[in-house]
Amino acid sequence: MIVRLGYVAMSMQVSNASPSKTMTAASFDKLNNRAAAVRKLERIAIENIHNTLRLLKHNRAHDIELYRCSSKLIPLRGHEMLNDWNPMEVLTEAFAELGGYAIKNAMRLSFHPDHFTVLSTPRADVLANSLADLDSHVAMLEAMGLDESAKCNIHVGGMYGDKQAASQRFIERFKALPERIRNRMTLENDDKTFTASETLEVCEITNTPMVLDIHHHEVNHEEELADCTVLWPRILQTWKGQTEQGTQLELPPKIHVSSPKSEKDARSHADFIDPGPLLTFLRSIAPLTPRVDVMIEAKKKDDALFQLMKEITEESDLEVLSQASFKL
């Protein structure tokens, strides 16, 4: 099994390269010249996209082919003060350059919309904002020229006093999404509400790939399903038919990995990854899985990736393939 590692949004090694620079709504509102204020937002967005390109070049130098883009590339995107603003007109060239670089270097990019993007909500206003947010994320992927292998990952959401009703709301609304959005979605188990098995059921009903978060599973699972590997054959099936950018090669399933910050704070993410639980999981799924992509959700970002690779070199049964991939 070939394993590729990736990280989320920020690099600890590339200085002055934040892809999430912003302007507060209060600061925007204080600017008397609205046109000038909008131009400032657009300049910040272009800088964020340019910094993302810098990060991709850093990734290429270190053989990192898996990367999650910041959801904050466009500041104040979706804010009620800017309902008449279409930033994509100005950002087309910058996004095209970013996506072109990713395609040229066979990089797998994704988004993970923020926690307020929930389709299971009982509130109409939250739902409307969630739908707009998903549309915006997909529009960015489209502007990059990326096909449907570039995904947006979300959770099923809260249970709002009735988990079954919340799940049903999610399913109905998910099925009603425009095809261009629905085909780019993946669903992930969360750390408090919807377990891996419950999320998998929703994925099977909606025909959507599942991203298994093994840390979330550790802190949120049914007693009889403590070992998430029993779900893996079904999770693999949710990825059937998914192909890599511009090819007919099967898109590898993706998992998330993080380590608990402490015993008392088991849900929060630590700075680095404890390789033990990850390698135990990977060894157990290897016979069924030709390739898997692992997104590292650690506070130290790419430093955590490099540290994990360093520890992997000490494992006798693992073959290092690159600075960010290995075989077992």
Residue positions per predicted region:
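Short active-site loop/helix that positions an aromatic residue
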Residues: 218-222
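Eukaryote-skewed repeat-based solenoidal scaffolds used as protein-protein interaction platforms
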Residues: 134-206, 215
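Conserved, mostly hydrophobic/aromatic
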Residues: 112, 213, 294
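Alpha/beta catalytic barrel-like cores
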Residues: 1-108, 117-131, 135-146, 176, ...
